[in-house]
Amino acid sequence: MTKAPQLPDGLVVVVKSDCPTCVVVQPVIDRLGAHVVSEDDDAGLETSYLLDVDTVPTLIRVVDGVEVERTVGWRRPEWERISGTEGLGEDLPPYRPGCGARAVDPAFSSELAVRFGGSRMRSRRVELAELEDEMEALFDRGWTDGLPVVPPTEARVLRMLEGTTRSPDDVVAVVPPDLVECTVEKVAINAVLAGCKPEYLPVVLAAVEAACTDEFNMHGLLATTWFSGPLVVVNGPIAREIGMNSGINAMGQGNRANATIGRALQLVVRNVGGGRPGEVDRATLGNPGKYTFCFAEDEDGSPFPPLSTMHGLDAGADAVTLFAGAGVQGVVDQLSRTPESLALSLAAALRVVAHPKLAIAFDAMLVLSPEHGRVFREAEWDRDRLLAELGELLTLPGAEL
């Protein structure tokens, strides 16, 4: 880490021009003859960062080149005590809060951390030629899913890591098919590539952990010739906090969180684990959901408890559920007004998933639209009753299998 610059003995004030408090205390600063560090220029911004200033104005007293004490904002008693000068700013109120320092502004802090903070990222750096197009370079190196990605600069990755309290060196999972240890830092890099915001990172980390369990069997999902890929359903308050879509077009395009969280998972599997099409990924045709397939459950509008409660979690817990999804198959029933009738339509559609005679060879996730969900809510059917009804309707004679 770059050392803080040597400060002159006496009083030092860190300010910025667009802070109203800094403006009103300027006559006080002039009276004290303090050394001014302005965040408006690069040198001052560097000094502010290295002095760990988070609020301006910050008044610092320096003795023999060493900081002795400081105060932030405008507090007349504190300024008078530190400076040893009475009667400061008598035309000002005794107290006025300061402003957030530019050095801690997310627009600057990540770049400052790269330049002066002694960042110790472990991932290999890739240097590009001056005239090399960074977007094309990522395509050329095979680090994309076929769509453009966001170049993962060190500043962007550090900003992404601010979305979690976990250490960048923590191993999140061993990613198939190459069984490579994947750290929080590696997940963050791929989250940047995917276009995630830092607040999405906890969901991406959870999805990566879930995908790399033996129960989910990501290696098997890659190796199959079937259409399927990982589908992510998000439950809990975090879905709303990060702006996920659980309503109209929830499985489609248009929502950044839905699109980039699922994409980040796929990029981790591809770039860290080596799960690339034509290699271990043997899908004959694939499906568009292998770019990204992620949405939130509409917990408020659902006739049933959250999906996550089926796996032992309490309602209201933040959670991700993964499923090997092969694509979307619609169910049309605009006539049923009873749950029994609607269950018949659902069962008929479920029976033909993949092939009507292969009843136990394929799984399905049933996602109800609000209109169909309302039928079960008004009849007070719970999830268990619907599952039992579907089980009865899908029990077939052996001759039909």
Give, region by region, the residue ranges found by the protein language model:
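Short active-site neighborhood of thiol/selenol oxidoreductases, capturing the structured segment around
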Residues: 5-20, 29
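Structural motif
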Residues: 14-18, 41, 369
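The canonical Cys-X-X-Cys-His
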Residues: 19-22, 59
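Thiol-based oxidoreductase modules, predominantly thioredoxin-like and allied folds used
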Residues: 33-46, 55
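Structural micro-motif
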Residues: 51-60
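Non-catalytic, surface beta->alpha helical segment in thiol-disulfide oxidoreductase systems
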Residues: 62-103
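Iron-sulfur (Fe-S) cluster-binding modules
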Residues: 89-122, 129
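Non-transmembrane, aqueous-exposed alpha-helical and coiled segments at domain scale
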Residues: 113-401
